[in-house]
């Protein structure tokens, strides 16, 4: 079997100007980045606002193994299959972060015969969105330090600056640093640190903004620090929201590319789902809905993280809620949740599938709480056996959830046809009646307890001393009506990554809250979730190279 990059490089790409015509986009509506990439103009996005939105399909997954369960691959294959059925379909996906590409994950543009192209460009610098977000974030850091140096009129306490610098790489050495050393002309010495770019609040803001005006307002609402008397300092106090918006004026435009089968794809934004809200941009999803009859989108990691945040945080900013939710499951992950060691996952084990099914069952029940129809997609792997597949299908039938085997990695659109037909049938037969899990009027404490008990299956929430103080402070600042974005391990329903399956009778501890007032949510920190990842012992970068003719090598 060819590698992902070999498959991608064997495809004869169509000019993006031809691809976008399939959904009514003309050459004048796009800004080209070479022959195969483009950005969509503000004028076109404005022109389609009055269009009736099409059907929205959200792809999510069970709690993943470290390798992931193939949500992006399944999303791409499902969109290709829908187009093959004659349904005008678009993709709306996140763009990869360079850090994980160079680290543990390799490429992140789908896999096998379900990929978005040109995958090398998408995985590396793409159209420069990540660089623009990094620059805007670090410009703000520089402006904060300059304010301290130039007299500090706002009375910012250097010990209480919460805005960090960012880099789109995995670099553990930069998690905690000291800046301003050397001499008085080098600034005010203080503790600082770096996050990965996709953890920046500016990434979340870009993905939730509805236009340039909204982007500017959200940037102005960012809290960067506290004064000596513990009052919040906003970007608007520094009067630099205009400059930050200027840096991001092109990055806010969604990117257009294509799949192997020529399906138009909007790929834009990429916040992580374990430390942010894990969804692509509102602009990309909204525009796809108004251009196509079916839009396929995804939310990061398992349904307890990405899908919960999609439904509670992103949907209120969209023209509509999902018409169906597809939960991707793999037999290897179910066996891992059933107690099988990673080294033994290739061996047939139907009993482990039965035990691990508890994880999938809880995700199905959770998504049904939102009153949206659910379909299970089994992402087929070579090691899967007929007995294991039959076991999983029978278990799905017991809880009356439609289930289909999909082999889009190996067979592309054809491998997703059964799933696509089932999804269309479910949408036609069962109307969604979206219901949000909590109200904005609930307190932050109530929202957290709701998520932990209703989605995670936990018994109770313990708030650490700092979190308890912040609950009171944030209410005084007027932030208590914002949604909650939980920062939690992706591997478990709990805050313990080794607690697999569907655990019950556990507590989750919130050690502190982080205000993301520009994005419009409050992050609740649990466990030891890192906002700047490190590299593994053998980084994926070690297998990468470039040929003399410029062709990328070893990129997954």
From Swiss-Prot:
> Which BP terms in the Gene Ontology apply to this protein?
tetrahydrofolate interconversion
Give residues annotated as binding ATP. Answer: 65-72
What this protein catalyses is:
(6S)-5,6,7,8-tetrahydrofolate + formate + ATP = (6R)-10-formyltetrahydrofolate + ADP + phosphate
Pathway the protein takes part in? One-carbon metabolism; tetrahydrofolate interconversion
Q: Which GO-annotated molecular functions does the record name?
A: ATP binding; formate-tetrahydrofolate ligase activity
For this protein, the record's CDD domains field holds: FTHFS
Tell me the keywords, alphabetical order. ATP-binding, Ligase, Nucleotide-binding, One-carbon metabolism
| Transmembrane portions of the chain | none
Q: Does the keyword Transcription regulation apply?
A: no
PROSITE patterns of this UniProt entry? Answer: FTHFS_1, FTHFS_2
EC number(s) stated in the UniProt entry for this protein: 6.3.4.3
- Spell out the InterPro entries in the cross-references: Formate_THF_ligase, Formate_THF_ligase_CS, P-loop_NTPase
Query: Sorted alphabetically, which Pfam families does this protein's record hold?
Result: FTHFS
Q: Which family does it belong to?
A: Belongs to the formate--tetrahydrofolate ligase family.
Q: What name does UniProt use for this protein?
A: Formate--tetrahydrofolate ligase 1
The top of its lineage is: Bacteria, Bacillati, Bacillota, Bacilli, Lactobacillales
